[in-house]
């Protein structure tokens, strides 16, 4: 690790981006036999936890824009894993529910977490601490501390 504060290897954002890209890539061969992409897998995980859900509820749960969720749901519908239906009494709300095929897919997908833990060289005992760290980072990113006057000055003043 370099002493240079601007060295690429020292940047948290760079390390997180590489880790995210690498982990998502490692999921590809695991999810392929299930006929799912990683984003589709996330939608299915949310629906296996609770179904039906509205498009908005799924969007909120996954922290994705509804416009990003819609094509994923349409593809899952074409694959026969989910159905989309207008909510009774509210034509503007679309409910997403699992089909029997989507429910059955869970029996195969249940192996994914342990496979991924092994593929990434982790131990199940490592997961609680890793999850705590990730949840802490997510919470910090959701509510970053405001810039101080000194930080603002350092960023705007020529040196």
Regions found by a protein language model. Give the residues of each.
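N-terminal leader segment of winged-helix/HTH proteins
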Residues: 1-34, 128, 149, 153-155, ...
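N-terminal helix-turn-helix DNA-binding core of bacterial DNA-binding proteins
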Residues: 14, 21-68
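Short amphipathic alpha-helical/adjacent loop interface patches that line ligand
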Residues: 20, 62, 66, 106, ...
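Charged, amphipathic alpha-helical coiled-coil/dimerization segments
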Residues: 24, 74-132, 142
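Short glycine/proline-centered loop/turn elements that form peptide/ligand docking sites
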Residues: 34-37, 68-71, 75, 147-150
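Acidic/histidine-enriched, glycine/proline-rich intrinsically disordered or flexible terminal extensions
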Residues: 133-159
